[in-house]
């Protein structure tokens, strides 16, 4: 019984940690380039609330995922323009993005329909692998019971590692 609890805890941790893996991968690239980005949490909040809004408006989780990623990228570009091009203090812009993201997500989130929130609060993407893979003892649920976003995030981590440590541009980034 204790093994089951441990495995289920790890499965939930992998699933719930996916947004942090994606944000952390981007943050590693940002920090390696010499930019202090304290606005990651604000970008995540903006991406989450706009993704939720787009999913509830279009009834398509793929549209919501793309809109959330695009809006977080837009806020990332705002931070880049302010911090790099305009030479504004990186701490101030990062904290400002967190405050803006918190306020906007709270305001937009309050406008949401509670029925839609309940509907979208569970997993909206289907697992990639068939159910027979989930039955493998030990590693089955941990490796094969996730939706495509989890596997894409693992791919981004591997791609970022390859880029940073195996390419000339990555070497320039680390220098």
Where does each model-flagged region fall?
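Short cytoplasmic-facing helical segments at TM-TM junctions of multi-pass membrane proteins
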Residues: 169-175
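Interfacial loop-to-helix junctions that mark the boundaries of transmembrane helices
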Residues: 3-12, 62, 87, 138-150
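Transmembrane helix-bundle core of multi-pass membrane transporters
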Residues: 102-166
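Single transmembrane alpha-helix segments in multi-pass membrane proteins
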Residues: 8-57, 65, 74-91
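Residue-level recognition of pore/gate-forming positions within transmembrane alpha-helices
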Residues: 48-49, 72-73, 98-102, 157
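N-terminal presequences and immediately downstream first alpha-helices
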Residues: 1-13, 107-108, 115-116
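Membrane-interface starts of transmembrane alpha-helices
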Residues: 59-67, 90-93, 97, 145-152
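Hydrophobic/aromatic residues within the transmembrane alpha-helices of Major Facilitator Superfamily
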Residues: 17-18, 25, 100, 104, ...
